[in-house]
Regions:
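Detector for C-terminal structural segments
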Residues: 24-25, 191-194, 200, 293-327, ...
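A structural "hinge/loop" feature
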Residues: 31-47, 69-71, 96, 148-158, ...
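N-terminal lobe/hinge region of extracytoplasmic solute-binding protein
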Residues: 28-77, 105-108, 115, 180-181, ...
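Extracellular/periplasmic solute-recognition and catalytic clefts
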Residues: 130, 188-199, 215-278, 285, ...
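Surface-exposed binding/hinge segments that line
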Residues: 120-166
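Gly/Pro-rich hinge or "lid" segments in bacterial periplasmic/extracellular proteins
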Residues: 153-209, 213, 333-338, 342, ...
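Aromatic- and charge-enriched surface segment that lines or borders ligand/interaction sites
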Residues: 72-116, 138-140, 228, 280-282
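Alpha-helical secondary-structure segments
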Residues: 99-106, 136-140, 183-184, 211-213, ...
């Protein structure tokens, strides 16, 4: 966004009059939340989709699955049929009943656009959806699929839109009439580049929000967002650590009692994906050298202010089935130089390397408005220059970076694992489709067909020991191929003003428990 546009947004926000406590909770996000189609992806923002739409079952912080729009379920002995009993008395916010017919209509709409969801293995495995009674729904799979319940709990696509709000012919692939769900919030106004306003759903079946309105102001710049919290323009910062600069978080967190803050347990892994199908990172020696050349301990200490622990592998060993007993590549600049020397990448008089007249140069792509990614990229650029690799930094809009991830126009590019409940199964599943950077990063590997076949076997494995064995083999192959540079284990942060109470972390990185928050003056047992 230009400085002039940023100023215009700031003026509009500064002139806004905040209502009395208890009426409005004000948050911010870098972009508008999008049209909020529950069955599609960007520009729809996941935290907002999860505020309006609900799943059959919900993921808990302890890794278990709890009833939600379904109160109970059974699984057939062969693992192929799931029978759900739906919660009675639930309606969509437009008054349409939530029943088995509505559930089937949503599954039909999702499966009519099955190719768009091929990254998620459950959509491949669903054979049919059936109405088994007014409040009884049956899902029949082609084969057993261990992560079925966890994938049904994801923020998208298996959430429920009022059938009355679907597009022509009951479809959603080309758009919806309105974002109408069963959740605690309703999207009531969007002002492009300014804000999105949600109203509490008065017919919500669960615990009612304590605030009448949730306003999400569009603030692209992390520094501006930190200032907005400090001045009282917004009440809450919540999300990945890059929402505000880490030094601003540490400063604001210590301003009690006016402001309070917290850091979550590690939720995901921040990585760079290295493109094995594009020179010069098609050379395994170059990928290994990059892994050995980055001083992650210094990076974590100086750029991330120690908020995120160093990552050595794609998944933390605490992730289910992910402790593969691997040895970290480890920071060793001398070893990185030897790898490049032995691979024929010779230094020139300027200290940079080349082979056969081709310079050892690579592009590193990052979200331009993400100050944290930019700072990390600059450290990596400097570390790689020390071993003779020239890095050109490219900062672009998030949508452009997502497009690069999908089509492979990158040398190095930022990414993250997705945290619970995606990791590891759903994240691994997505590696088989060109929907994220992982497919493109792996595409040049000779063993790519074997990698994809192993992922398919992992998802079908009913025996936990066999699934763990297969996962360990897969993670070993990816680690040895060096197509990822793990950087740190990403955390969520929250900072809120003293007028807000009940702020806590959700079970996943992409869902914000706004409905649990309340004015500090309210009783805790409200």
């Amino acid at each position: 966004m230009s400085k002039l546009a940023s100023l215009a947004v700031a003026v509009v926000m500064a002139c806004a009059v905040a209502p009395a406590a208890g009426q409005q909770l004000t948050y911010s996000w870098p972009t508008n939340v999008g049209p909020l189609n529950p069955h599609l992806y960007a520009p729809n923002q996941m935290f907002a989709q999860a505020s309006v739409y609900e799943p059959l079952v919900r993921y808990r912080a302890d890794g278990t699955i709890e009833p939600w729009l379904a109160t109970a379920w059974t699984v057939s002995p062969d693992g192929r049929t799931y029978d759900f009993i739906l919660r009675p008395g639930v309606t969509f916010s437009d008054g349409t009943p939530f029943d088995a017919a509505a559930v089937k209509a949503n599954f039909d709409a999702i499966l009519a656009n099955r190719a768009r969801h091929e990254w998620l293995d459950l959509t491949r495995q669903i054979d049919r959806a059936e109405i088994a009674g007014p409040l009884a729904f049956r899902l029949v799979l082609k084969a057993p699929h261990d992560p079925t319940l966890r994938e049904l709990a994801l923020p998208r696509p298996f959430r429920f839109l009022s059938p009355a709000a679907m597009g022509e012919g009951g479809t959603t692939a080309s758009g919806i009439k309105a974002p109408v769900g069963t959740g605690p919030w309703r999207l009531v106004e969007t002002r492009l580049g300014i804000s999105d306003t949600f109203a509490a759903n008065p017919t919500y079946w669960g615990g009612k929000p304590a605030f009448a309105r949730l306003v999400v102001k569009v603030i692209p710049d992390p520094n501006t967002r930190a200032i907005a919290l400090q001045t009282g323009e917004i009440d809450l910062v919540y999300g990945a650590a890059g929402q505000i600069p880490s030094e601003a978080f540490l400063r604001l967190r210590d301003q009690a009692p006016a402001v309070s803050g917290a850091v979550s347990a590690p939720l995901a892994t921040r990585v760079l994906a290295l493109n094995s199908a594009r020179a010069p990172t098609d050379d395994r020696a170059v990928r290994l050298a990059i892994n050995r050349a980055v001083d992650k301990d210094t990076l974590v200490r100086t750029v991330l202010d120690g908020l995120e622990p160093r990552a050595d592998f794609l998944f933390a060993p605490s992730v289910p089935d992910a402790d593969a007993g691997l040895t970290p590549h480890g920071f060793d600049r001398a070893a990185a130089n030897r790898l490049l020397d032995e691979a024929g990448w010779a230094r020139g008089t300027d200290g940079m390397r080349a082979k056969g007249g081709r310079p050892l140069a690579v592009e590193l792509d990052f979200v331009g408005t993400n100050a944290q990614q930019k700072a990390i990229a600059e450290v990596i650029q400097a570390d790689l220059a020390r071993i003779g690799i020239a890095v050109r930094l490219v900062g672009e809009e998030e949508s452009a970076i997502l497009a690069r991830q999908k089509d492979g126009r990158f040398g190095l590019i930022f990414g993250e694992t997705w945290g619970p409940p995606y990791d590891p199964a759903s994240f691994l599943s997505a590696m088989r489709a060109p929907s994220h950077a992982d497919y493109q990063a792996q595409r040049g590997l000779p063993e790519k067909p074997e990698i994809d076949a192993t992922i398919t076997a992992i998802l079908a494995a009913a025996d936990p020991a066999e699934r763990k064995r297969l996962t360990a083999g897969l993670l070993t192959a990816l680690h040895e191929s060096a197509v990822y540079l793990p950087i740190s284990h990403a955390v969520a942060i929250e900072v809120h003003r003293s007028a807000i109470a009940g702020v806590g972390f959700g079970a996943t990185l992409n869902e914000i428990p706004f409905a649990a928050m309340r004015p500090a003056s309210d009783r805790a047992d409200r």
